[in-house]
Amino acid sequence: DKNTYKVSGGLHGVGVSCVNALSTVLHVTVHREGKIFEQEYHRGVPQYAVREIGATTDTGTTTHFKPDGEIFTETSYNREILAGRLRELAYLNRKIRITLTDEREKDEQGNVLSEPFYSEGGIMEFVQMLDRNGRRNSLLPAPIFIEAHDAPSNVAVEVSLQYNDSFSENIFSYVNNINTIEGGTHVAGFRRAITRVFKTYGDRNKLFEKSKIEVTGDDFREGLSAIVSVKVPEPQFEGQTKTKLGNSDVMGVVDSAVADVLNAYLEEHPKEARTVINKVVLAAQAREAARKARQLVQRKSVLTGSGLPGKLADCSENDPEKCELYLVEGDSAGGTAKQGRNRAFQAILPLRGKILNVEKAMEHKIYENEEIKNIFTALGVTIGTEEDDKALNLSKLRYHKLIIMTDADVDGSHIATLILTFVFRYMKALVEQGYVYIAQPPLYLVKKGKEQIYAWTEEQRKAAVATLAGGKEDSVTIQRY
């Protein structure tokens, strides 16, 4: 309904209908045309017709609803999830103030918890936050900001981008404030403009001549953080989940908007332009080195056949669906894990120390790393398929459960984070297919005589001592892992 909303994330107008059907109570108050209206529903059934209850100078709608406990097993809301989404909306809609109030908890002064979300700079601040949280150092003095409106299609475009010293691409895209995690035509238009504009600038100024390697679109996106946000009156999504935009005209609109601003920026900032081009050249050289390193990983697995890592304690089962691979830290942990495992379906691979931080390493260094090569070999995965020479090939995957099992202390948490980062960046298909798990080992074992209780937190440890010895720590044995 274009008379109600300029743009909307909804497609079918069933949002409030579904909430109503799934709530025990839903109450709506509308301030409109100088009047206040209300209506209440119980489990989707109206309790009375829409009625006028007063006068107002405001406009807007307030909706109260209570999830139906007979439908949902969990009806309490997670404040952190809501806060994350509202923070995102504040960045995407600059200068709009959003307040999250949680009346379930109070602060030390007895006040209800209330958190405001407001962004003066919008998606420029969003990009800066992404790099700050990722501990990436920016290469440009400030993010580049692009804002445009295409009159024929009535599509509005906002883009902010920043280059940093990392080796990965971080692009987040939105359509009418919906996160399109699979991208779509708006992201394709953005990438096309980035590649074309930088390539043209580099060729014109003879900045690629020394590299002796043909640069590709991927090279221009290494170390790029960006937010691409479009407002589309009639969005067409591929699939019901709204994760990929399909409007073909949006690609050209975004491409044109980004190219116009970027061309002007490069001409006005030659120093920054050269900084980015130098990074692109390095990315191309690293890509070529990584290609050779990937071929070595591929060739090694082909030539050596079943040459599994020497430290791998494999299982006897051959069916991948029944097999589990535990990644543990060090030989000592590997030893105890081997003693406690079920040999039939549980395999153990000890890793030596902290594995490489792939977020800060060049790609070819990753494929040359011994521990990472061992993970590839043990899993039986390789790089390259018939369709894509960089895609993960799972055709010979040996385990359908990859379990990261590190100590419960800070060090163990750090190692688990490093492994997860590697898996997410270079074996994402395993995550997407639900093959990756994190073990939850206890931090303490509290023992008295033949009774023992495992504890995962300090609070649980104290509770275990209270249970076994009435709180007397000197009468129990506490083992910290």
Curated annotation (Swiss-Prot):
<dbReference type="InterPro" id="IPR001241">
    <property type="entry name" value="Topo_IIA"/>
</dbReference>
<feature type="binding site">
    <location>
        <position position="407"/>
    </location>
    <ligand>
        <name>Mg(2+) 1</name>
    </ligand>
</feature>
<keyword id="KW-0963">Cytoplasm</keyword>
<dbReference type="InterPro" id="IPR000565">
    <property type="entry name" value="Topo_IIA_B"/>
</dbReference>
<dbReference type="InterPro" id="IPR020568">
    <property type="entry name" value="Ribosomal_Su5_D2-typ_SF"/>
</dbReference>
<dbReference type="InterPro" id="IPR013759">
    <property type="entry name" value="Topo_IIA_B_C"/>
</dbReference>
<feature type="domain" description="Toprim">
    <location>
        <begin position="323"/>
        <end position="442"/>
    </location>
</feature>
<dbReference type="InterPro" id="IPR034160">
    <property type="entry name" value="TOPRIM_GyrB"/>
</dbReference>
<keyword id="KW-0460">Magnesium</keyword>
<dbReference type="InterPro" id="IPR036890">
    <property type="entry name" value="HATPase_C_sf"/>
</dbReference>
<dbReference type="InterPro" id="IPR014721">
    <property type="entry name" value="Ribsml_uS5_D2-typ_fold_subgr"/>
</dbReference>
<dbReference type="Pfam" id="PF01751">
    <property type="entry name" value="Toprim"/>
</dbReference>
<dbReference type="GO" id="GO:0006265">
    <property type="term" value="P:DNA topological change"/>
</dbReference>
<dbReference type="Pfam" id="PF00204">
    <property type="entry name" value="DNA_gyraseB"/>
</dbReference>
<dbReference type="GO" id="GO:0003677">
    <property type="term" value="F:DNA binding"/>
</dbReference>
<feature type="site" description="Interaction with DNA">
    <location>
        <position position="354"/>
    </location>
</feature>
<keyword id="KW-0799">Topoisomerase</keyword>
<keyword id="KW-0479">Metal-binding</keyword>
<keyword id="KW-0238">DNA-binding</keyword>
<feature type="binding site">
    <location>
        <position position="409"/>
    </location>
    <ligand>
        <name>Mg(2+) 2</name>
    </ligand>
</feature>
<dbReference type="GO" id="GO:0005737">
    <property type="term" value="C:cytoplasm"/>
</dbReference>
<dbReference type="InterPro" id="IPR013506">
    <property type="entry name" value="Topo_IIA_bsu_dom2"/>
</dbReference>
<keyword id="KW-0067">ATP-binding</keyword>
<comment type="similarity">
    <text>Belongs to the type II topoisomerase GyrB family.</text>
</comment>
<dbReference type="InterPro" id="IPR006171">
    <property type="entry name" value="TOPRIM_dom"/>
</dbReference>
<dbReference type="GO" id="GO:0003918">
    <property type="term" value="F:DNA topoisomerase type II (double strand cut, ATP-hydrolyzing) activity"/>
</dbReference>
<keyword id="KW-0413">Isomerase</keyword>
<dbReference type="InterPro" id="IPR018522">
    <property type="entry name" value="TopoIIA_CS"/>
</dbReference>
<comment type="subunit">
    <text>Heterotetramer, composed of two GyrA and two GyrB chains. In the heterotetramer, GyrA contains the active site tyrosine that forms a transient covalent intermediate with DNA, while GyrB binds cofactors and catalyzes ATP hydrolysis.</text>
</comment>
<keyword id="KW-0547">Nucleotide-binding</keyword>
<feature type="binding site">
    <location>
        <position position="407"/>
    </location>
    <ligand>
        <name>Mg(2+) 2</name>
    </ligand>
</feature>
<feature type="site" description="Interaction with DNA">
    <location>
        <position position="357"/>
    </location>
</feature>
<comment type="function">
    <text>A type II topoisomerase that negatively supercoils closed circular double-stranded (ds) DNA in an ATP-dependent manner to modulate DNA topology and maintain chromosomes in an underwound state. Negative supercoiling favors strand separation, and DNA replication, transcription, recombination and repair, all of which involve strand separation. Also able to catalyze the interconversion of other topological isomers of dsDNA rings, including catenanes and knotted rings. Type II topoisomerases break and join 2 DNA strands simultaneously in an ATP-dependent manner.</text>
</comment>
<dbReference type="InterPro" id="IPR013760">
    <property type="entry name" value="Topo_IIA-like_dom_sf"/>
</dbReference>
<feature type="binding site">
    <location>
        <position position="329"/>
    </location>
    <ligand>
        <name>Mg(2+) 1</name>
    </ligand>
</feature>
<dbReference type="GO" id="GO:0046872">
    <property type="term" value="F:metal ion binding"/>
</dbReference>
<protein>
    <recommendedName>
        <fullName>DNA gyrase subunit B</fullName>
        <ecNumber>5.6.2.2</ecNumber>
    </recommendedName>
</protein>
<dbReference type="GO" id="GO:0005524">
    <property type="term" value="F:ATP binding"/>
</dbReference>
